[in-house]
Regions:
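N-terminal topogenic module of multi-pass integral membrane proteins
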Residues: 27, 35-133, 140-146, 303-304
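Hydrophobic cores of alpha-helical transmembrane segments in multi-pass inner/ER membrane proteins
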Residues: 80-91, 136-148, 193-203, 261-272
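Hydrophobic alpha-helical segments and helix pairs
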Residues: 128-179
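Alpha-helical transmembrane segments in multipass membrane proteins, preferentially the mid-helix core
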Residues: 144-149, 174-176, 197-212, 229-238, ...
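Interfacial segments of alpha-helical transmembrane regions
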Residues: 213-224
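Short alpha-helical packing/oligomerization segments
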Residues: 241-264
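Interfacial loop-to-transmembrane junctions
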Residues: 274-292
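Juxtamembrane boundary at the C-terminal end of a transmembrane helix
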Residues: 297-305
Length: 305
């Protein structure tokens, strides 16, 4: 005999959960619109959504850039940036004076980088664009994710594991650099732009995890400005070299202009925050992340090799 009370209770519980999901989603949207900082009382769902959204954004942009390639190759335009943020977080884990709560929250924020590596690893293995070096980079990124997520409480053992994770991360960086050897167009896979992306992502991870390393965060802002200037010089030098080659045809001067203008916008945003001594909010970092991650797209639109 059908238990109607059980059915109604199940339906009511499901409806309540769905209502809670909609409420939390609404709160997340309101946080984005208001530009609020991450609060201590923020629900776990919002923290998870705040961590997932930047990775989702990176994957969408990365695969869109992949689709624009004339000769598809399973090589991420943003993987070096994700490796960079993981290495920066390792510095915070090893050198930063953080409590177990902050360490745990930052470890959970790092866990979402594993999604980026899993998607790229499955894509590389499951398609005809298989790239062994990309597999190596993904495995290194996944190993770092697991180590930073499950950190032991014993200090010496934790430091040993984190240093091993740093060594694995450097192997991933070497593997990615080996993929760049045969690339004629460095601007699309610009290492300086990807390191800048990693610095912004690291700042974002610290904000999401409500970390109190104010000195380290301020240092990251200065590093972002330095790499933004370095990236601009790198791009201008490469454009000069490419302009001397008849094999390069500039097809969209507007995209090239927009690529360079984005540097000015990002420089202005960072400079205002530095001079006013403002902390970068989640919203500001998300805007910077979007602009930095989109640079490979504008580089692709600008010319065809």
């Amino acid at each position: 005999m059908l238990d109607h009370n059980f059915f109604y209770r199940t339906f009511a519980l499901t409806f309540d959960r769905f209502g809670e999901f909609l409420h939390n989603a609404r709160q997340f949207c309101l946080c984005l619109l208001q530009g609020n900082h991450m609060s201590e009382e923020q629900p776990k769902f919002l923290t998870a959504l705040s961590s997932f959204f930047p990775i989702f954004l990176l994957l969408v942009i990365d695969f869109f850039a992949f689709g624009l390639q004339l000769q598809p190759n399973a090589m991420s335009h943003l993987a070096l940036g994700v490796l960079t943020v993981q290495l920066i977080c390792l510095i915070a884990f090893i050198k930063g004076e953080i409590c177990n709560g902050q360490r745990s929250r930052l470890g959970l924020a790092n866990l979402y980088f594993g999604l980026f590596w899993m998607v790229w690893l499955l894509f590389s293995l499951g398609t005809s664009y298989h790239n062994v070096f990309m597999d190596l980079v993904c495995l290194c990124g996944l190993a770092m994710t697991i180590i930073t997520w499950k950190q032991p409480f014993e200090v010496k053992l934790r430091h040993v594991l984190l240093k091993i994770a740093g060594f694995i991360g450097m192997l991933g960086v070497i593997g990615y650099c080996l993929m760049l050897v045969d690339e004629e167009n460095f601007i699309k896979f610009n290492p300086a732009a990807q390191i800048l992306l990693g610095i912004i992502l690291a700042n974002l991870a610290l904000v999401i995890s409500r970390n109190r390393l104010k000195g380290f965060i301020a240092l990251l802002m200065l590093a972002a400005i330095a790499f933004l200037a370095l990236n601009a010089l790198f791009v201008l030098a490469n454009l000069f070299i490419l302009s001397q080659q008849s094999a390069v045809v500039f097809t969209n001067e507007f995209a090239l202009l927009l690529y360079l203008l984005l540097h000015l916008v990002m420089a202005a945003m960072l400079a205002i925050h530095v001079f006013k001594k403002w902390a970068l909010s989640y919203n500001s970092l998300l805007i910077l992340l979007l602009m930095t991650a989109s640079l490979p797209l504008w580089a692709t639109f600008a010319y065809l090799p």
